[in-house]
Amino acid sequence: MNKKGYLTSTQNLSFESSKLLNEIDWFGFKQDNNEQDPVKKFKTKTDKLIHSDFVVADLNNLTTETAMELGIIYGIAYSKAVMDEMFSNTDYELQNQIKFLAKKHGLKDRDIYCLNSNKETLNKYVEGGLTCLDTFFANSMGEIEKECVNDLEYLNLISKYTSIEENMYILSDDEEEETWQLTIED
């Protein structure tokens, strides 16, 4: 099954890597949601965003739409961190069932890549939120492509050595490193 990718609301992003084009189904690359009804457009794009494994955003041309998309991603990561903490002391089988259901509904980790050729002009609040999400910042699409290909190859490699019953469990990885900045304080 191909991974899913999401390009934020910009027309300036494109890939040259055939690996990225063949192994990731991108929303926003060759097609866009031309729906005129604002609610339908929001729901369609948000559904694609929620179920994506990879998100690429152009911060050089930051729009309110891109800011909203990145805010949704942060909200999902925060919700996942809360859920992970709530169920951290349950048995292994229950944890895997909960992770499966969470992933099915978009509560999962995703790789985020941001094109930003001038980090000094980026709003510090936005930069802080993206840093909490372990975002990869790049000066060019070439850098993003290289990092994305490496991440994709890593995911393909670990999936070969991990047995997963698709209908029951999801990959149980160590997510502490990725979500430590989102840990809920007492």
Regions found by a protein language model. Name each.
Residues M1-D186:
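Conserved catalytic or regulatory cores that recognize and/or transform ribose-phosphate-containing ligands
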